[in-house]
Amino acid sequence: GYNIILVENPAEAAIRGLSKYITTIEDNKYNLALDFGQSFIKRSIISVDKSGINEVHTLEKIKSKYVTWEFNTKLEEEVEAKKEDQYIVDCITNTIQFCMENNYELGKEIVISIANYVENGKLKNRGGYGKLRLIADNYEEHLKEVLYKKLGTEYKITMVHDGTAMAAAFSEYPNSVCISLGTAFGVGFPIDK
């Protein structure tokens, strides 16, 4: 038989799953966990210890922009990719600034779920964030470099497909699948990291 589990606060599922991708736990520090969706960017500040996530501070969500994925020309796509990239960088830097102003001491890892297939920082040419592949072959490394230039701090950036991030929140259930009904229908499977 099947077990169907409905969760409270399903909008936090990807954020909770992202906590499992944090590789270095820094005592008394928080991590940024961002969920870049097709409609909104959900922003959270999370605290993680050896037993897992223990605090989630949800910030105001931001409207997603520049997530169109059909273009008439390559130039049109490149122009839109640059706008989307700048919007993402601004979102991250503004959120870091908010944390500094509100006494959240951040660790050196930022975890991001994204409504696009991604593997080791390489975004696939599919979906509203797929055009970011035109900005950099490895978008995680690109963000790391841009944030260092802007802020003088070196962050480790980890990007995960949003469905996979959600599923990670349920990784303790064997042979599981996570189904989401957001802007689009989504499916994710927990993976061994």
Question: What label would you give each PLM region?
Answer:
Residues 14:
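Catalytic-loop motifs flanking and including active-site residues across diverse enzymes
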Residues 17, 165-169, 187-189:
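Adenylate-forming
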Residues 19-62, 175-193:
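Gly/Thr-rich phosphate-binding beta-strand-loop-beta motif of the actin/hexokinase/Hsp70
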Residues 24, 34-35, 101-103, 147-151:
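Short, charge-rich binding segments
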Residues 32, 45, 89-106:
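Short amphipathic alpha-helices and their capping/turn segments at secondary-structure boundaries
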